[in-house]
Amino acid sequence: YAYQVYAIALMISSFSLPTAVSKLVSIRLAKRQRRNAFRVFICSLAFAIGVGLFISLTIFLGAGLISTHLMKSPLSVYALRVLAPGLLIVAVMAVIRGYFQGMGTMLPTAISQIIEQVFNAVISIVGASVLFGIGTKAGEKSGKELLGPAYGAAGSTLGTVIGSLSGLLFLLFVI
């Protein structure tokens, strides 16, 4: 259930950013307005940070209400809270990828996507396994038998966030 909320929030925060930034940057560069192309990047980055931060905080702080009342799945609160910072990360990464595309190079984007998916796969599997075990033990102590799967789901969503963060760190290194 947490991924449904994440997907909607992701569309709101960063769905068309790479395309818009790419188009605006390439138009400026075609007119030899390098400084204006960079201004587009900076303004887009500020927008992405603002919107991404707002949506991330809204999801993180409202995870209890969203999971209980909207999704009717109270234990999905853990996965929602793990996914929330990823919205900011992906929004910033979308702008940087769009900037590179507008500059005429897709190599940094391609490499960052590979890095992102490798980290996502590994961390999702390891995180789900480790946190499932921790949640199961905590559930036995507290009498909540579904705590193990809830923690496991949160562990698997950790891969999404760490994967995005690794891709972003690569792009920041390249830029």
Task: Show where each model-derived region lies.
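Transmembrane-helix boundary and interhelical linker motifs in polytopic inner-membrane proteins
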Residues: I12-A46, G102-L107
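Selective transmembrane-helix segments that form parts of the transport pathway or gating/packing helices
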Residues: S44-S56
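Small-residue-rich midsections of specific transmembrane alpha-helices
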Residues: A2-V25, I55, P85-V92
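Hydrophobic alpha-helical transmembrane segments
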Residues: S112-V126, V130-V174
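Interfacial/gating helices of multi-pass transporter permease domains
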Residues: Y1-I8, P74-L75, P149-A154
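Membrane-interface junctions at transmembrane-helix termini in multi-pass inner-membrane proteins
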Residues: V90-S112
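Alpha-helical transmembrane segments of multi-pass membrane proteins
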Residues: L61, K72-I96
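Short membrane-interface helical motifs at transmembrane helix boundaries
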Residues: F54-P74
